[in-house]
Regions:
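Glycine-rich phosphate/diphosphate-binding loop of Rossmann-like nucleotide-binding domains
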Residues: 11-20, 30, 34-46, 180-218, ...
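Gly/Ser/Thr-rich loops at beta-strand to alpha-helix junctions
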Residues: 7-13, 90-104, 186-197, 217-219, ...
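A conserved active-site cap/scaffold subdomain adjacent to cofactor or substrate pockets
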Residues: 209-272
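N-terminal glycine-rich anion-binding loop in soluble enzyme alpha/beta folds
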Residues: 5-70, 121-129, 141-162, 167
Length: 405
C-alpha cells in the first residue's frame, strides 16, 4: 500500500494522475491531503482536517503560510506513523515545489529507516540536506515544475510511481536485508582515512560485529550521531573528524553540535582518533579569505584547506571539551605520523608543528578525565593501527562489567 502525501488544493490534478497510475499497477493507495488554502481538487482518503487535528490545531485556523506548513508537517508525521503502525503504509510518495517538499520530507523523516520514501521535487538539485536530514529519503528532480501533466512531467511522475510501487512491494513482502543479531558498531570514515578504517572494520567483522560506516560528509555525521543517541549502537570507532574541522573553518559538510557529544551522552564505549583534522572541506572552490592557504583539490566537487597550528590547537581544545565528560570507557588514539593520506612525511599537508599543537591541546584538555590516551608512532591509515583500535574497542565492549550490564 502506497501513501500519496501532498497539497491537494494546488497539486490535485498531479496527485489524481499518480493515484490512477498506481491503481493501474494494482497498488492500493491512501491519499493524504496536507493543503490549507482552497478546496481539494481530488477526494482524499485522509482529509486535511484529520491531519490538522493530529497536529493539535483546529482545522481552518491555519492562515499564515509558514505556520500552516509547520503544523501540517507535524500532523502529517503523526498520520504517517499511525498508518505505518497499522500496516497500511509500505511506501510514501510526494511531489511538489519548495513548500510541499519542506512539509512532506519533514513528515517522511518521522518514519523508520527502511520504509520507502520518495520525494519528487523541483528543489532536488543543489543542497538538499534540509530535506533529507539523517533519513534514507530518496529525492528525484522533477526537471520542470510540478504544475500540470505534460510530456516531461508525465514521464518523471510515471517513473516515480513505478519506483515507489516496486519499493513498496518489496517492503510489503518482507524482503529487506535480514536483521542480524551481531552487535552494531558505528565507524566514521572519509576518503583520506579509508585504509585505516577498512582495516578496523575487517577486524571488527571478524570479531563478530556488524559495522556501520558513516561517511564524514556532514549528513553522515548527523546519521552517526542520531544512531548513537537512539541507542542503536553498541559502541563507536570514531576515527574521522573531518566534519569537526570543517565546521570550525565554516566549510561545506558540517554535522551539527551533536557530532562529538551524542555518543558521550549515550554512554557508549568509544575508541576515537583524530583522522582528517589536518583539513577542512569546501566545495569546488574556497572562500577568498582562505585562498592564500595550502589548498588541495580533492576532486571536481571537493577542495580542502590545511588547518594551521592555531586552528589545530583550537580543535584539540574543542574535541577535549566534548570528550571530557565521558563516563563510559573511552580511548583516544593519537597517530603521531599523520592524520590523513595527505598528512604524512613528504605529503602535501605534512606539518608536525600543526599536528603537535593538536596533540598538546588534547593531552592538556583531557588531563584528569577518564579518557585514556594512546599514542602511536604511525599515521592514521596504518592497517596495524586500525586493527589495534578495533581490538581495543572489542576489549571495552566485552569487559566483565560491561558484559554483565
Amino acid at each position: 500500500m502506497v501513501v500519496l502525501l501532498g497539497t491537494l488544493d494546488t497539486k490535485g490534478a498531479e496527485y489524481g494522475w499518480l493515484r490512477d497510475r498506481l491503481r493501474a499497477r494494482g497498488v492500493r493507495v491512501v491519499l493524504v491531503d496536507t493543503g490549507t488554502l482552497d478546496a481539494p481538487r481530488v477526494v482524499p482518503d485522509v482529509p486535511r482536517e484529520e491531519v490538522a487535528r493530529a497536529a493539535g490545531v483546529m482545522p481552518g485556523a491555519l492562515r499564515d503560510r509558514g505556520a500552516a506548513v509547520t503544523a501540517m508537517a507535524r500532523g502529517a508525521a503523526e498520520v504517517l506513523r499511525r498508518l505505518h503502525a497499522e500496516g497500511r503504509l509500505h511506501g510514501v510518495l510526494s511531489v511538489g515545489g519548495s513548500g510541499n517538499s519542506a512539509l512532506s520530507t519533514t513528515a517522511m523523516r518521522a518514519l523508520p529507516v527502511g520504509v520507502p520514501k520518495l520525494m519528487v521535487s523541483s528543489m532536488a538539485s543543489g543542497d538538499v540536506s534540509p530535506y533529507v536530514g539523517d533519513s534514507d529519503l530518496t529525492l528525484m528532480y522533477s526537471v520542470v515544475d510540478v504544475a500540470g501533466i505534460n510530456r516531461i512531467s508525465a514521464r518523471v511522475l510515471a517513473n516515480a510511481a513505478d519506483a515507489i510501487a516496486g519499493m513498496a512491494a518489496g517492503y510489503a513482502a518482507g524482503r529487506p536485508v535480514p536483521r542480524g543479531d551481531r552487535p552494531l558498531v558505528g565507524a566514521t570514515m572519509a576518503g583520506v582515512t579509508t585504509r585505516g578504517v577498512d582495516a578496523a572494520r575487517d577486524r571488527l567483522t571478524a570479531l563478530g560485529y556488524e559495522v556501520l560506516v558513516f561517511h564524514a560528509s556532514g549528513a553522515g555525521g548527523r546519521s552517526f550521531a542520531a544512531m548513537a543517541a537512539d541507542g542503536a549502537l553498541a559502541g563507536t570507532l570514531d576515527a574521522t573528524m573531518l566534519e569537526v574541522s570543517t565546521a570550525h573553518l565554516g566549510g561545506v559538510g558540517r554535522a551539527g553540535p551533536e557530532r562529538l557529544t551524542a555518543a558521550v551522552r549515550a554512554g557508549l564505549p568509544q575508541v576515537i582518533s583524530v583522522g582528517a583534522l589536518d583539513m577542512a572541506k569546501f566545495g569546488p572552490s574556497v572562500p577568498n579569505r582562505l585562498r592564500h592557504r595550502r589548498v588541495h583539490v580533492h576532486n571536481a566537487s571537493v577542495t580542502v584547506v590545511r588547518t594551521t597550528a592555531a586552528e589545530c590547537a583550537a580543535l584539540g581544545r574543542s574535541v577535549a571539551a566534548a570528550l571530557r565528560g565521558a563516563t563510559a570507557p573511552t580511548a583516544l588514539y593519537l597517530p603521531l605520523r599523520g592524520l590523513s593520506t595527505l598528512d604524512v612525511p613528504g605529503g602535501v599537508y605534512w606539518d608536525p608543528a600543526a599536528d603537535g599543537a593538536l596533540f598538546d591541546a588534547l593531552r592538556s584538555g583531557l588531563e584528569g578525565s577518564r579518557v585514556e590516551i594512546r599514542e602511536a608512532d604511525t599515521d592514521v591509515n596504518d592497517p596495524e593501527l586500525g586493527r589495534a583500535m578495533a581490538d581495543h574497542l572489542h576489549a571495552l565492549l566485552t569487559a566483565p562489567a560491561r558484559a554483565a550490564s
